[in-house]
């Protein structure tokens, strides 16, 4: 298989190139199809186009999709992953809402968008990516749909999105009050609390909950691009996770809570014996 990447973000471009993936230094937008076609004599026909969590980051989706279609032949498959709105409201994933994510989709709305650009969704599945994502498979001018896709559409018809959003609001306000109450109590008792991880979603969560550096000492992170920064708004410093392991706190908030199943065993294996706090979907303290 011959692969060609399209990447306008400097660090991702450098990483792809370092790993031997030929990559164009530009974003996927108007005019990109022509630039790629210039290289097709070397790479061959476009058989597969993959856009994982890209649509939500695209400023003008109606410039993006015509370029996708312009590269496709009758047997080309366009595979995309998008955060599923149903999962967002049912799992209270409010912290996935931040400045880089411009839109969220149901399968129905994604199919309607694709249809405007001659893309037919023929299959779809729900994955655990980002707490719940639509992995869609589309081809040009297709009409047939898989049973799996139709089942997801039926599932969506059973969901009251507006009602779920209202319920989510109340749950989050309750979580906020409980978390702040817990952190204040721990501080009063002389306990130390930190955060594990500095994902982008942490900025939304910490600012909405009002968790500041008065209550949380720091966030422990392994990504060198984040170490040495602070969380906007609440001004909590980001340090390397070695700080946590050298001087373990009493409590650690798992900010990438959707990955708690991996994070908690990891820190236990590294010797951390304190307690974990999960802030979403419900406030939970894990011994």
Labelled PLM ranges:
Residues 1-34, 214-229:
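Class I SAM-dependent methyltransferase SAM/SAH-binding core
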Residues 44-50:
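A conserved beta-strand element that flanks and buttresses the S-adenosyl-L-methionine
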Residues 78-103, 107-109:
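Short, glycine-/aromatic-enriched active-site segment of Class I SAM-dependent methyltransferases
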Residues 119-130:
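Conserved S-adenosyl-L-methionine
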Residues 62-79, 268-269:
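A short glycine-rich, Lys/Arg-flanked "PGG" loop and its adjoining helix->strand segment in the class I
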């Amino acid at each position: 298989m011959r692969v060609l990447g399209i990447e306008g973000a400097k660090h991702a471009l450098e990483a792809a190139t370092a790993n031997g993936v030929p990559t164009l230094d530009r974003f996927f937008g108007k005019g990109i199809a022509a630039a790629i076609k210039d290289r097709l004599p070397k790479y061959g026909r476009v058989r597969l186009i993959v856009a994982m969590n890209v649509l939500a980051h695209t400023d003008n989706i109606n410039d993006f999709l015509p370029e996708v279609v312009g590269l496709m032949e009758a047997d080309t498959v366009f595979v995309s992953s998008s955060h599923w709105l149903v999962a967002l409201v049912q799992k209270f994933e409010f912290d996935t809402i931040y400045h880089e994510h411009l839109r969220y989709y149901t399968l129905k709305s994604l199919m309607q968008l694709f249809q405007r650009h001659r893309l037919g969704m023929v299959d779809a599945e729900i994955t655990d990516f980002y707490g719940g994502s639509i992995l869609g498979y589309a081809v040009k001018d297709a009409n047939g749909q898989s049973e799996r896709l139709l089942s997801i559409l039926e599932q969506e018809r059973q969901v009251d999105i507006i009602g779920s959003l209202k319920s989510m609001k109340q749950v989050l306000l309750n979580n906020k009050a409980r978390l702040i109450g817990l952190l204040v109590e721990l501080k009063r008792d002389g306990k130390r609390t930190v955060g594990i991880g500095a994902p982008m979603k942490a900025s939304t969560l910490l600012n909405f909950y009002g968790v500041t550096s008065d209550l949380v000492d720091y966030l422990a992170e392994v990504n060198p691009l984040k170490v040495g920064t602070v969380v906007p708004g609440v001004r909590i410093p980001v340090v390397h996770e070695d700080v946590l392991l050298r001087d373990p706190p009493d409590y650690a908030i798992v900010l990438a809570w959707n990955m708690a199943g991996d994070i908690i065993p990891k820190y236990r294996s590294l010797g951390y014996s304190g307690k974990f706090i999960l802030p979403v979907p419900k406030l939970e303290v894990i011994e």
